[in-house]
C-alpha cells in the first residue's frame, strides 16, 4: 500500500536525531528503574556479558521468547541459525531500545519510518533498506534488515545495556510453533544456548509475534504480517 502523508504527520523531531552514547546504567531511566524494581539487574548483566563474549542467549521480549546474540558478531549469528536449524538465506530480526539507534545501522532512513514507529499500537518490525554495520550474514540479500524498537522493560534494558542491536528470532526450531512463554521452549534449545535469562519465566499469558512491515525507499509500505 502507498504511504498517505495526509493521514500521518511527519515526526520532524525524530528525523536525523543523533544518538548520545551514555554509560550504560540501570538507574535514572524509566526502563532501568523497572529492571531494578523487578530484580532483573543481575540477569541482564549476565546476559550482556555472555553476548559481548560472542555467546547466544534465550530471553523474553516484547512478543514471544527469543534467541539472541550480538547482531554485529557474524560467528554468533551463525550459531543462532544453527541452533534454530534455519536456512541462513532467511534474514533475522534485530531488536533495539530506541528509534534513535536506527540511523546508526540504516543509511538514509526514510521519513516515513519514524511515523510508522510512532503510530504503531503493537510490537511492529520494520524492514528497511541499506543496512550497515551489522553482521553480513544477518542482512538479507537485497541489503535490507528487519528492526524493531522494543517498549517492554526487560528487553529494552537489555538492548540499552548491550549498546548494540540484539538478534531476536523466536525460540523454536524452524518450522515449529514459536514459544509464547518460557515453558514452551524445547529442551534442546535450552541446552544449546550459553545463557537462559531467569526473568519472566513464570508468565502464562499468551504472546504473539510482531507485525512485520516492509518499507521501500520510495515510501511504499507493504504489510508482510499483521
Regions found by a protein language model. Name each.
Residues 2-16, 32-226:
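Active-site-adjacent structural elements in enzyme catalytic cores
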Residues 16-18, 23-24:
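N-terminal amphipathic/hydrophobic targeting modules at extreme N-termini
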Residues 27-29:
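Glycine-biased, low-complexity coil/linker segments
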